[in-house]
């Protein structure tokens, strides 16, 4: 069975995490404006419920704890009971950790992996049985350009998003014969709360890393609220992509993200070609 496109579907049922602000909030708005129905989850669902009270018949705002498998299962069950199915799962909830790799503590690392990777995977695993049963569905994982390119100060956050990239690519191959699609979204800097309340800075500061990770910390302070990316346009782009006839596996958003991804590909190609003979000489001789 091949993958099915949402382009010819009627009104969609969305299940979106992290909807109190940023990409999640704007996706709720854009989906409701399309006439779709939305299950909006966050730690403070009251905000979403109040903002979109006029669409209460097409909105279910519920709290969701991505650390709690039982809570996740109950949330998914509520969604299906209310709307009959789920068409699109958007794993948007996430958290940042800023600091050099050596500066980050075990507990800081575990906390960001818990939400960005384990929580995302828990929810995906809870929704997939419904997708398999209906032979359709689309998983949208919010990664980052930091899931393709590692930068000073973002090492641990990069690691979580690199994990999301690998998970998404593998799931796409596994689920395609079942009618399920996957898209991993890689935004650059957007004017959300990511550099504010959604970001934790490693407590330890090592002076030797001031010219690298330290400069990134200062960048986060200086650029917060002045990022060039518009989350409203990002939400529209995500919807356009996943409702197209051939949705992409990878969706890069923003000029800076596009430039960094292109530079990464060029750098990889250069390494591949430089070390081609060495690479090809390591197999057993047949």
Which ranges hold each PLM region?
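Active-site-adjacent segment of SDR/Rossmann-fold oxidoreductases
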Residues: 149, 170-181
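Conserved glycine-rich cofactor-binding loop
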Residues: 20-22
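The beta1-alpha1 cofactor-binding region of Rossmann-like NAD(H)/NADP(H)-dependent oxidoreductases
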Residues: 64-74, 106-107
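SDR active-site lid
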Residues: 177-247
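Residue(s) in the substrate-gating loop at a strand-loop-helix junction
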Residues: 144
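Substrate-binding pocket helix/loop in short-chain dehydrogenase/reductase
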Residues: 100-101, 108-110
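Active-site helix of classical SDR
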Residues: 124, 160
């Amino acid at each position: 069975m091949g993958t099915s496109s949402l382009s010819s579907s009627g009104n969609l049922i969305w299940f979106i995490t992290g909807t109190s602000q940023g990409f999640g909030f704007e996706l709720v708005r854009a989906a409701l404006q399309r006439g779709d129905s939305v299950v909006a989850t966050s730690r403070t669902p009251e905000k979403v419920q109040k903002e979109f009270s006029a669409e209460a018949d097409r909105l279910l705002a519920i709290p969701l704890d991505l650390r709690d498998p039982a809570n996740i299962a109950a949330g998914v069950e509520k969604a299906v009971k209310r709307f009959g199915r789920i068409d699109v799962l958007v794993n948007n909830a996430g958290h940042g950790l800023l600091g050099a790799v050596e500066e980050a503590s075990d507990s800081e690392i575990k906390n960001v992996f818990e939400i960005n990777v384990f929580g995302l995977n828990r929810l995906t695993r809870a929704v997939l049985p419904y997708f398999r049963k209906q032979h359709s569905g689309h998983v949208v994982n919010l990664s980052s350009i930091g899931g393709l390119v590692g930068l000073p100060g973002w090492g641990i956050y990069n690691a979580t998003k690199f994990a999301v990239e690998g998970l998404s690519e593998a799931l796409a191959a596994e689920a395609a014969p079942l009618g399920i699609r996957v898209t991993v979204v890689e935004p650059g800097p957007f004017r959300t709360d990511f550099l504010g309340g959604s970001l934790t800075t490693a407590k330890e500061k090592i002076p030797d890393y001031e010219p690298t990770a330290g400069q990134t910390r200062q960048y986060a302070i200086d650029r917060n609220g002045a990022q060039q990316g518009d989350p409203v346009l990002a939400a529209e782009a995500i919807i356009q992509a996943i409702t197209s006839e051939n949705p992409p596996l990878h969706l890069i958003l923003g000029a800076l993200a596009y430039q960094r991804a292109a530079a990464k590909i060029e750098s990889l190609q250069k390494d591949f070609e430089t070390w081609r003979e060495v690479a090809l000489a390591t197999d057993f001789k047949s």
